[in-house]
């Protein structure tokens, strides 16, 4: 009887591991079907108690694996651009820009996961799937991300994604009007505006 129970437990574990692997592979395959796209997005941030913290909107351009432009237009403008080597963050309100090497960018943030679609990044998560909905839980609790969920169709269209931080704060993004076309190369280049302070961390 004990041998039967042990065998059942082992089989259950193998099936569970296989399901997680299949979910991760399916998610990567779906995202991999679209290498370049543009979409509008809306953002809603809520506290752990469910209180609204911020609502915003913007535009997103992606050309995988390493080019993207995340342009937040409201409530405050900010821009995050990758030119393939450098990651630029620009805040017009404070007239400051930060430059870091893209290769040093962490893979445990939702945006980097979506844009890079790097197999090494996905290995850091347990992935569960229910239809077009994927739920990701970090294997390590050392980071700030507690849970990440994304809805993506079989053809690679991202409908929404949500990130929950360790303190319970939830950031939900809804994407609309995704167009799978190649963006102009200028979208992935950043020129430091006159009078803007640069914090260059590429040392």
Curated annotation (Swiss-Prot):
* Keywords recorded for this protein, A-Z: Chaperone, Periplasm, Protein transport, Signal, Transport
Q: Where is the signal peptide?
A: 1-21
Q: Which GO terms describe its biological process?
A: lipoprotein localization to outer membrane; lipoprotein transport
Subcellular localization, per the record?
Periplasm
Keyword Signal tagged:
yes
Role: Participates in the translocation of lipoproteins from the inner membrane to the outer membrane. Only forms a complex with a lipoprotein if the residue after the N-terminal Cys is not an aspartate (The Asp acts as a targeting signal to indicate that the lipoprotein should stay in the inner membrane).
Q: Which HAMAP family match?
A: LolA
Subunit comment: Monomer.
Stated name of the protein: Outer-membrane lipoprotein carrier protein
Organism of origin is Yersinia enterocolitica serotype O:8 / biotype 1B (strain NCTC 13174 / 8081)
């Amino acid at each position: 009887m004990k041998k039967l129970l042990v065998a059942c437990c082992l089989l259950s574990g193998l099936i569970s591991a296989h399901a997680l692997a299949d979910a991760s592979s399916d998610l990567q395959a779906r995202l991999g079907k679209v290498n370049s796209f543009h979409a509008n997005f809306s953002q809603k941030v809520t506290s752990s108690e469910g209180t609204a913290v911020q609502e915003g909107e913007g535009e997103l351009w992606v050309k995988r694996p390493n080019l993207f432009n995340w342009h937040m237009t409201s409530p405050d403008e900010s821009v995050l651009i990758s030119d393939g080597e450098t990651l630029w963050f620009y805040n017009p309100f404070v007239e400051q820009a930060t430059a870091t090497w893209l290769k040093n960018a962490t893979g445990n943030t939702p945006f980097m996961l979506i844009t890079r679609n790097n197999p090494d990044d996905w290995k850091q998560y347990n992935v569960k799937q229910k239809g077009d909905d994927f739920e990701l839980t970090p294997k390590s609790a050392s980071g700030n991300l507690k849970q990440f969920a994304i809805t993506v169709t079989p053809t690679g269209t991202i409908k929404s994604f949500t990130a929950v931080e360790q303190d319970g704060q939830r950031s939900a993004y809804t994407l609309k009007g995704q167009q799978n076309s190649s963006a102009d190369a200028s979208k992935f280049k950043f020129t430091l505006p006159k009078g803007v302070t640069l914090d260059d961390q590429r040392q």
